Every structure is written in structure tokens, then in C-alpha cells.
Amino acid sequence: MKREYSIDLVRITCCLFVVLGHCMLVSIHQSPVPVDPMFSVWVEQLVLFIRWVVPVFFIITGYCIAKKKTCTYSYCFLHVLKFIEVLFTVGLFFAIIELVFIERTLNGFTFVKALGKVVSGQLWDHMWFVYTVIGIYLVLPVIHCFLQQDIKSIITITTLLFIFTILIPYLDKWIHIGIRFPFEGVLFYVFFGGAVAKINTKKNWRYIYSLILALCMVYMVFFLKIDNWENIFHPVGCLMSMNLFLLWKEIYVKPSKVLLTLSGLSWGVYLIHPFFINVAVKGFRINLVGSLSWLKILIFFCTISLLSFGTVYILKKIPMVKQLF
């Protein structure tokens, strides 16, 4: 499979946006001082836009798997074991840290409680992605088989998934529709990525992608208080994620060692950045609001990003832990 450097750029960009979103949220939700209500509104609205880079990760998975000639269960099980290992090492560490922040003590019971949180999925919010990816990899060989069909079949399957996992659940708020498809919209995002890999999208469509993105953002602003934008399966937000990927994918990117290095570190940065955020806001109780709030958040974001990339770069040099990141 020929490497597409634009996908590496998309992966890095999405990772940085996730870090930025988390830095912005803690500024208002973990502030040691009262927060201006108007500032909170602005932060939450911007984070709602940023949130829609998360489905792009699933689209990338589908895009890359469709480019592979084969996808065996032995390959997928190795990845599943890796993610399970991440949960019971990195996830367990995060659970222990959180319990120490809450209980201000560390003992044998702390470890037992932390283990329970890993099993029950009660970790820091960003770890939901790890649990979801495990589920995706368990069915990835089946998805790969579908993505080897003709273009018409792939488009049909992807369209049906959009209707039954994205559109109908949304419309059900107003019109009860009895037909159900027992899968979440994550499966649609994976199939959409695979469909894009099989279809030659035209570069002169980037203006159309940009227009759709702009319309989605305008809609989100006007209907901010009506719809549940935190749900990553909202139809308008879904269109936003799809067009973000299509637009970014068309960017011409020159091969670069720095780009490949940062892309290889992105997964680890996604995993580890909340550790630095939580230590800063819960341990050192830093204040990101008040005067020059936006500048403080920007500096905080840059600091967390540099710490995360630097830490993961070092950790990947250690044989015993590099497979986790």
C-alpha cells in the first residue's frame, strides 16, 4: 500500500484538536475560581466544533483497511491484545491517579478499585475510544470483506448504515420509527472511510466540501441549544466529520521525516495528554480563566502538546513499553 502523507497530516491534526478541546474544557470545568458565563458559552461552542474531529479517526481506520489487500483475524487479534494491554496498564495507571486525586491516599484497595474501573469502563473520558477500537478490530476482517465488493455495493452498504445508524436514531426524536439496526454509527464512519478509499474523489470538489462544512457550522450555531451536539452520531455533525476528512485528504503533503515521526506519536499523545492536564489542574490547581484567558489556554495547549509528544517519543525508545504507544 502506497503511503499517503496527507493521512498522516490528518491524524496529527485530529490529535492536536483533541488535545486543544480537552485543554479548553478543563479551563471552565476544573477552574479553582468562578468562571464568566459568557466565556463558558464561547468555550463550549468551540469545543462542540472540535469534537467532530473524533469520528475522523474511525474514518481513517476504514480508509486504511480498505487499502490493504488482506485483513486476517490473526492481524486483528494482535491489535486487540495491544489495546487490552493499554487498558490494563495505561488505563489502570490513570484510574489509580484519579483515585489518589479524590481520596488523597494510596493503598492496596486503591489498586483493586482502579482495576474495577478498568473492567467497567469508568476511566477518564477519552479512554472510551480504546474500548470502541477493540470492538472495531473484532469485526474488521468482516468489514474488509465487504469493502472488497464493487463500488456500487460499497456505496449501498455505506448509505444503509448512514440511514439506520445516524439518520433514523436522530429522526426518532420526533417521529417514532420501529425499524432498527443493532449497530452504532461508528460502523458507518469505518465504512465511509473504506468507500472513500475505493472511490476516486476529485480534487476540484474541495470547494464543495468547504461549503458543506460552512453550512454545517452555521446550522450548529443557530441550533446550539436545541440539539445534542455531544453525540458524535448527529447527522449534521456527521456531515461535518465526513467533509473534514475529504477536505484534509486532498491536501498535498511532501514526504517528511518529521511528519512521519509526529504521526507515529499521535496515538501515544492521545493516550497520555490527559495525564498532564489532570496533574496541572487537579494537582497544581492552575487557573486558566480571568484576564488573558485565551492566551493562557493557548500556552497551556502548547505546553501539554510538547510534553505529550516529548514523553511519548522517549517512551517509544523503551522496549518494554513502546508497543503501548
For the regions a protein language model found, what residue spans apply to each?
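Interfacial loop-to-helix transition and helix-capping segments at the boundaries
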Residues: 42-55, 116-132, 169-189, 220-243
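Alpha-helical transmembrane segments and terminal signal-anchor/GPI-anchor hydrophobic tails
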Residues: 183-187, 198-260, 268, 275-283, ...
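Juxtamembrane "helix-exit" motif on the non-cytosolic side of transmembrane helices
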Residues: 30-32, 100-105, 167-175, 220-228, ...
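Transmembrane alpha-helical segments of multi-pass membrane transport proteins and ion-pumping complexes
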Residues: 190, 194, 242, 246, ...
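Aromatic-anchored segments of alpha-helical transmembrane domains
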Residues: 16, 20-23, 91, 158-172, ...
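Long hydrophobic alpha-helical segments that form multi-pass transmembrane helix bundles
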Residues: 151, 156-199, 203
